[in-house]
């Protein structure tokens, strides 16, 4: 009898083990979807007068954060960058064009925190350390990482980030608030591209000149094949003004918002007669990017810098070159 029961029990145990194993996660099973959002914090730090041979300056730091957030309210992934922009104008009221614009992250080692500032790590390395640190934290836990003088707590410093982090946190706070249901998941890679364009106008008689920049941010979750599964964007316009003597006429008390952040108050429908508001048109462009690689997005733009026929039919009639050039950088 024992000889019959023993083999039977062994077979039963084997079947049970296989059954339990089959109940686990299957190979290739898609991870749960995550919320996805982009936040931008803008800080104008200077608008000085020109004086003789010394040009006047307009300075602005635009900090962007993209995050994915799990069902538990914790940040699953985060990417950060800062567009640190300086424009100038002369004492004759002439705007000076910049050769190019690069974010702090794009500058890499050339930013020079190690070479010129004596820092142990370059800016992008410290940025990455902070972005890694916020993973797995709630928003309140992230906000608690800011200490005196806008620098990080000991936890932040020990992680390798000794730079000021307050504006990172302010951008993350906006990204968290903007996070919405998406097709992004933990298997995807979060990416952020930035493109800045400049337009200059000299002062003439009693008409102010301007040195204006428009910085477009394109954030995306990308799958293993490099295809976009979720996308969003923002654009910040900063217009530094001055008179024909190079004296700044920029209002430093003015609160700046991104075009998406401004919502309906941006006024494309009310004042420009557009069928859709800026954020609605941007959403139409972003939707057209789903399933495409960064290089394929360039095909969405025509020779006139507007969208192709499909983009226009989808409701995006604004210039899309900023979106396309920012998106190209996530490749």
Task: Give residue ranges: language-model regions.
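Active-site- and interface-proximal helix/loop "cap" or "latch" segments in soluble metabolic
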Residues: 30-331
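Positively charged n-region of N-terminal signal peptides that target proteins for export
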Residues: 1-11, 21
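Sec-dependent signal peptide cleavage junction
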Residues: 16-32
């Amino acid at each position: 009898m024992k000889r019959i029961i023993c083999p039977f029990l062994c077979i039963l145990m084997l079947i049970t083990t296989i059954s339990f194993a089959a109940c686990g996660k299957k190979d290739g099973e898609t991870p749960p979807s995550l919320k996805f959002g982009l936040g931008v914090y803008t800080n104008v730090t200077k608008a000085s007068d020109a004086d003789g041979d010394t040009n006047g300056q307009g300075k602005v730091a635009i900090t962007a954060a993209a995050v994915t957030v799990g069902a538990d309210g914790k940040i699953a992934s985060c990417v950060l960058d800062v567009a640190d922009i300086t424009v100038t104008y002369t004492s004759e009221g002439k705007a000076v064009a910049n050769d190019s614009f690069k974010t702090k992250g794009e500058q890499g080692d050339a930013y020079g925190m190690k070479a010129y500032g004596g820092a142990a790590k370059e800016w992008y390395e410290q940025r990455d350390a902070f972005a890694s640190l916020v993973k797995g934290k709630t928003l309140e836990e992230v906000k608690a990482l800011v200490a005196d003088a806008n620098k990080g707590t000991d936890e932040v410093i020990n992680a390798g980030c000794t730079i000021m982090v307050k504006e990172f946190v302010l951008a993350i706070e906006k990204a968290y608030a903007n996070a919405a249901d998406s097709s992004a998941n933990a298997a995807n890679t979060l990416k952020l591209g930035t493109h800045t364009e400049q337009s200059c106008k000299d002062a003439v008689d009693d008409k102010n000149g301007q040195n204006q920049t428009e910085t477009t941010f394109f954030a995306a979750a990308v799958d293993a094949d490099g295809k976009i599964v979720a996308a969003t964007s923002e654009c910040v316009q900063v217009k530094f003004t001055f008179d024909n003597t190079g004296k700044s006429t920029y209002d430093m008390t003015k609160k700046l918002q991104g075009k998406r952040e401004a919502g309906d108050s941006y006024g494309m429908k009310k004042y420009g007669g557009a069928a859709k508001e800026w954020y609605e048109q941007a959403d139409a462009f972003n939707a057209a990017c789903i399933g495409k690689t960064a290089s394929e997005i360039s095909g969405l733009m025509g020779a006139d810098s507007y969208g192709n026929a499909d983009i226009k039919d989808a409701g995006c009639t604004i210039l899309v070159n900023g979106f396309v050039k920012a998106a190209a950088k996530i490749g």
